[in-house]
């Protein structure tokens, strides 16, 4: 009932009451309707007037209550709740995103109480959308930054991480549990804290885990050393005997090649060919090896303090940046400056929080928004020590991630460095000589030649692999669709395709691999896919829980991925330690009755329509 309608009804009540108090008129004796003289009322009993007013007030109160009750009853929860579901539309996750969004839309809407409007944007805009809080519910994927279960918890559920990834979840108790699991290697404590963290995730539902897929690539049979690494793809180990150039194609796109900004898989993939970090990963697995540092810090070698709060790295000699002709030498001060630059800039959607929050280096406004005073100590030109605010058991892993890559002091200190050829300067095995956005990237050997390799870490994987980089040049063609990738490898226009063939194309290539002379390689993938709720735009937990009940993971796997996707019931995948399938026990799949029961409990005063507003 509208306010105007309620007002009209109240006016009618008041008019009736006024008329009931008006003097009564005698009827005309001739029946002609003329007014007679007023009839003198009978004398009232003492107190009668007061009783009349009490009756009038009582009638008014009853009328107002009745009208208000009718208004509340007529404003019950609407039959349909509206919400927007956003997805990427330019191939960042391959050609399956539209089908995935449609399948989710159907499973949510099939419960009958929610309508889902689909919206999409290219990745560069999409990334800004979640930073600017334009999207109430949206699809994302996650590839690990470091190989610890914490990397599936703190980036999503810590206050700083949730802001970076667009949920804006804020739970100080969960923050405390995260800090406690990060600070110990005791499996009993970590089991307890990860259990509590995952239970809070299932109760608060800032995210809904959906599925994990398979890693995939296809390449001509003459190509060697194509490894589906659990953290980062390494082009510098790939070999095509008898050739000096490797041609590849992908449907992925670069967002930023500044280590202080990049926080997507493909940007990180390129960064890891051009930059080095203090420690790096083995070519096949997540075992750490020395990169820019001489050794991996441990308590055993004295480079990690007994309390786990101090990590010391000694730099290898002779390392220079490929800022030719300067050939700037790497120093401990440059490493410190690079870490502080990432922390100070704290660019939107970046991984800076892995340093100042997860890595316990701090971000102090009294120190120019750099790390906390004393957190980074330059001992001498080749030695740096990090003094953490608390123990972080996987700090070495954080130093292996791209956000920790040293950059020369010539980099922009007030904002993001351009991702153009000549502006991207690292110490890695390749330098980027060409970058045509969304079309082409060319990586060339940075130091010496194959016959005279002067790269400081060329024997990193010897004797298993020869000196790195193996190929002189990597030409990365950026395609507009998965169909183009399939055509590239069918015709052998390229040597390797990576990220991302569509499920039907993948099956077709597997069936014809022998006749085509190609290898189709599949591997387990640590990547997860999930729904994000911006809890500022969808603040009612019951709404988020209702949608969690309505999701149908089996439909996603069968319809979108032809049965190749595995259902995911926690943000920590089943292959990782401490994983608990909390969403399976609490929500299951496609439980519409439970979803609708929750929506029926939502107070009528709560706004359910969570549509994005332009900002």
In which residue ranges do the predicted regions lie?
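Secretory targeting signatures
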Residues: 1-78, 537, 547, 609
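Surface-exposed binding/hinge segments that line
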Residues: 42-44, 222, 333-334, 344-411, ...
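Aromatic-rich, solvent-exposed beta-strand/loop patch
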Residues: 91-94, 237, 387-406, 421-484, ...
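Detector for C-terminal structural segments
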Residues: 26, 64-65, 96-106, 127-256, ...
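Short, well-ordered beta-strand elements
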Residues: 80-91, 116-118, 243-255, 309-314, ...
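Aromatic- and charge-enriched surface segment that lines or borders ligand/interaction sites
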Residues: 295-351, 385, 488, 539, ...
